[in-house]
Amino acid sequence: MARYLGPKLKLSRREGTDLFLKSGVRAIDTKCKIEQAPGQHGARKPRLSDYGVQLREKQKVRRIYGVLERQFRNYYKEAARLKGNTGENLLALLEGRLDNVVYRMGFGATRAEARQLVSHKAIMVPGRVVNIASYQVSPNDVVSIREKAKKQSRVKAALELAEQREKPTWLEVDAGKMEGTFKRKPERSDLSADINEHLIVELYSK
């Protein structure tokens, strides 16, 4: 399945919630009709079955993290093999992706921009260039911007935006040096309550 390249707002309207796919710190304004489905007049949303609700939750989380269907399923399989709660393991794996860590540290205004920084070889972990967005960052890894990329205006703009967002407690960032430490994997209480990972587990358990 190809990566979606269309309007980001359309995806948020499809899921009925802000997926944080656009830069900025404010949630999508109500003028954007987030509660309406895509289309000029906003198609009426049908009442979903249990399966439909589970599927929509999976699609929502997949789109938040910018992961393709096959990748997402593989993350679920890995999460199920690990000890502990499968749903929480899944979220921890998604949060541990390098593109997500770069975004969380404030080096990219969106996860898509962070993914681009990674693919353009602007990111080092720890001290060597890594250009694989799905690379799993380990506790105590230092993630930094390459010297030649530090002057990029988009990185500076992203860091300014990040100052207005709540800072993740599992990360330690030195904005001046443009580097950060992945102190630990996030716990479920650290992450958004708007995600219902139990629905995803139910979907894949069938």
Curated annotation (Swiss-Prot):
Keywords for this protein: Ribonucleoprotein, Ribosomal protein, RNA-binding, rRNA-binding
GO annotation, cellular component aspect: small ribosomal subunit
Source superkingdom: Bacteria
GO terms under biological process: ribosomal small subunit biogenesis; translation
CDD domains: S4
Subunit structure: Part of the 30S ribosomal subunit. Contacts protein S5. The interaction surface between S4 and S5 is involved in control of translational fidelity.
The protein's role, per its UniProt record: One of the primary rRNA binding proteins, it binds directly to 16S rRNA where it nucleates assembly of the body of the 30S subunit.
Protein name: Small ribosomal subunit protein uS4
Organism: Shigella flexneri
Species lineage: Bacteria, Pseudomonadati, Pseudomonadota, Gammaproteobacteria, Enterobacterales
Gene label: rpsD
